[in-house]
Amino acid sequence: MINLRKTHPLMKIVNDAFIDLPAPSNISAWWNFGSLLGICLVLQILTGLFLAMHYISDTMMAFSSVAHICRDVNYGWLIRNMHANGASMFFMCLYLHIGRGIYYGSYLYKETWNIGVILLFAIMATAFVGYVLPWGQMSFWGATVITNLLSAIPYIGTTLVEWIWGGFSVDKATLTRFFAFHFILPFVILALVIVHLLFLHETGSNNPSGINPDSDKIPFHPYYTIKDILGLLLMILALLLLAMFSPDTLGDPDNFSPANPLNTPPHIKPEWYFLFAYAILRSIPNKLGGVLALLASILILLIFPLLHTSNQRSLMFRPISQTLFWILTGDLFILTWIGGQPVEQPYIIIGQTASILYFMTIIILMPLAGMIENYMLKPKW
């Protein structure tokens, strides 16, 4: 009998990607985050779809419609809390996924890595426009501050900002288009994810040792399907605990007040997952400089393959580079903390120091460490 799974045009694609896929035998739990991100995306699209059925993208109605979802819609509170905290879960998995890629040298699969960076930008854009939709104080002022950054672009800046706003301030037109963007972007992300997987399956997965694993491969199913299901259960458990017991922990109290253009909140800050970039933006006392630093802090990921100087792919056997990696991780935690603090001393100088360290570690120290390790491993006889 012909195995339909291996011959049917559609099932063959699924089979080659999730069942008979040859996978390295030694990939650790750090390789779970790719599948978890896929689950997060599906979860966000589904909860978002149900929210969109009840949400009204009008400045007079948006805030009330979100309150209506939480109070009057069947399990609306759960759908809304799962969606809001699902975004936090998404970014947690995303940052761990990127960290794994940096630690184990996965960025040397250049096409997969570059598509991943584009995905990061698309997800950040989606999260930003989504945060504006409840039309609370922080939604409104966050939208005003972040879109205003585009006015730093010489010559066309002001025109560009007014074009994005659809008027002379953040208003009804802005909210309506942000809702449209927030609805369409996840499907763009879905398409990019397929391309990301396509390029990954051209080369096969990397592994912790960084050595070519072709001589020792195992089928994806059942070994990694069961491992992914364990990861999924743990993530869903964490998400449900967060969404049911403390759904507002990661949110901003200011967003419980309806948007008021006449009253500015004392501290305007984005959600926790943007704070590191916000701290880098604020550390430069110049609008254009800050915007460029903000962009550079994420675009720098694109040059990781060019900055790789080591003869070894992974950091598994490279103690100096490992130390620098964990310094970079700690630095990102410091930047995240600083991004949530007011602009006053000592936070200003800490933020500036952490920003300099961030760029210096990636551009100078890590390539240098790779070269030193190469020299140390050279036979001296």
From Swiss-Prot:
Binding positions for heme b b562 per the UniProt entry: H83, H182
Cofactor note as given: Binds 2 heme b groups non-covalently.
Gene3D superfamilies registered for this protein in UniProt: Cytochrome Bc1 Complex, Chain C (1.20.810.10)
Protein name per the record: Cytochrome b
Miscellaneous comment in the UniProt entry for this protein: Heme 1 (or BL or b562) is low-potential and absorbs at about 562 nm, and heme 2 (or BH or b566) is high-potential and absorbs at about 566 nm.
Amino acids binding a ubiquinone: H201
A molecular function GO annotation: metal ion binding
Subcellular location per the Swiss-Prot or TrEMBL entry: Mitochondrion inner membrane
Keyword line: Electron transport, Heme, Iron, Membrane, Metal-binding, Mitochondrion, Mitochondrion inner membrane, Respiratory chain, Transmembrane, Transmembrane helix, Transport, Ubiquinone
Encoding gene (name): MT-CYB
Major localization class: mitochondrion
Binding locations of heme b b566: H97, H196
Alphabetical list of InterPro entries matching this protein: Cyt_b/b6_C, Cyt_b/b6_C_sf, Cyt_b/b6_N, Cytb/b6-like_sf, Cytochrome_b, Cytochrome_b_C_euk/bac, Cytochrome_b_N_euk/bac, Di-haem_cyt_TM
Reported cofactor(s): heme b
One GO cellular component term noted in the UniProt record for this chain: mitochondrial inner membrane
Lineage: Eukaryota, Metazoa, Chordata, Craniata, Vertebrata
Matches recorded under PANTHER family: CYTOCHROME B (PTHR19271:SF16)
Function: Component of the ubiquinol-cytochrome c reductase complex (complex III or cytochrome b-c1 complex) that is part of the mitochondrial respiratory chain. The b-c1 complex mediates electron transfer from ubiquinol to cytochrome c. Contributes to the generation of a proton gradient across the mitochondrial membrane that is then used for ATP synthesis.
GO BP annotations, alphabetical order: mitochondrial electron transport, ubiquinol to cytochrome c
Family the UniProt entry places it in: Belongs to the cytochrome b family.
Transmembrane segments: 33-53, 77-98, 113-133, 178-198, 226-246, 288-308, 320-340, 347-367
Subunit structure: The cytochrome bc1 complex contains 11 subunits: 3 respiratory subunits (MT-CYB, CYC1 and UQCRFS1), 2 core proteins (UQCRC1 and UQCRC2) and 6 low-molecular weight proteins (UQCRH/QCR6, UQCRB/QCR7, UQCRQ/QCR8, UQCR10/QCR9, UQCR11/QCR10 and a cleavage product of UQCRFS1). This cytochrome bc1 complex then forms a dimer.
Pfam families: Cytochrom_B_C, Cytochrome_B
Organism field: Lestoros inca
Topology class, membrane: Multi-pass membrane protein
